């Protein structure tokens, strides 16, 4: 958290910097629609109390609906009054088009607060304070766990992560390795540094030379992550002969069929 976006499009899901909660992926659903002429309609799905969307700055274009994001510019979010937020959409949007996307439009704490308030209100609960009262803090050492939610099995998580090339999920998986390794980590080591050390330990245990290996955040969105082709080939070979090979193979996108390879290599022997 606090890291700069990878590029000039911070609103798209691949730019999400994960946190331990990751409520709804830190994303908001945005639905857009337009007729041949007239205003462009925009709404949040689901709606959030105190958050509005202004599409008046969006211009109608003749771009194909399938390429609706070509004329898109990064939205602006501003707190217009205490507890009231407005998301201003910018750029262009095609005529006679409907589109929906999950985007990173507001600070994660605002999103979390609004979702918690909505769920609490639906259960008949009430808050005594106005929106905007969320406070960041460090978990006290003596905190008591009141609920626990177990994630889906590792194989299911991996399948979505690899087929969709989910960078945020990949980063979370690396951090989870670090969290599991923290007990054996040196004092003062961060979760990320413990995860990086755990990856290096695996390469050493498999007797794979890791000269030139640089583990940054575990995803494809890194300016510094490095691995030599020979090292990668050897790691894949070891994985294919390991007990988790079926899960790994099922997670890979099929060329021309699904995932990030759905529209690639069609009509080829691949």
Each language-model region and where it sits:
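Active-site Gly/Thr loop motif
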Residues: 205-212, 254-270
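Secretory-pathway/luminal and periplasmic proteins that interact with or process carbohydrate-rich
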Residues: 30, 144, 170, 260-261
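C-terminal structured domain segments across diverse proteins
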Residues: 225, 249-250, 258
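Polar, glycine-rich mid-to-C-terminal structural blocks
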Residues: 1-64
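Generic structural motif
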Residues: 42, 53, 70-79, 270
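A small/polar active-site loop signature that marks catalytic segments
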Residues: 62-246
